[in-house]
Amino acid sequence: MNKYIFDCIDAHTCGNPVRLILSKKPDLAGSSMSQKRSDFIKNFDWIRKSLMFEPRGHDIMSGGMIFPPNDPNNDFSILFLETSGCLPMCGHGTIGIVTIALEENLIKPKVDGILNIEVPAGNIIVKYEKKGSKVLWVEIVNVDSYLAAKNLFV
């Protein structure tokens, strides 16, 4: 049996848990976060299940991993993980992960107060205010909504 030790930081956003996975991140195939998400689901979903479900997580556990950006104009990218799956976008996860990353100096923003982040759903803009080592607030400009399909019959 293989043994793995993952370094994580746990936090919460208004009581909802968020876990940032720091170590043992897989090398994901793809040139976009959507493609990398697909690779994670296909080949590494055991990581999500191990860290989000009992006994290490619980039914509303949410979290993710930070990766370098695919586009150098962006600050970084996020892969969202939770008990329901590997999500294309998660507002709660974004707020928690950004707060952890800023307060722990895990990221260096290109512009103070603004982060350009790649997520599987597309690119998001995050605005924030930091005073000393604490993040005071986080605001998300989400991806545009779109029509994924029409005239479907169930």
Question: For each predicted feature, which ranges?
Answer:
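A glycine-rich beta-to-alpha transition motif near the start of alpha/beta enzyme domains, typified by
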Residues: 1-152
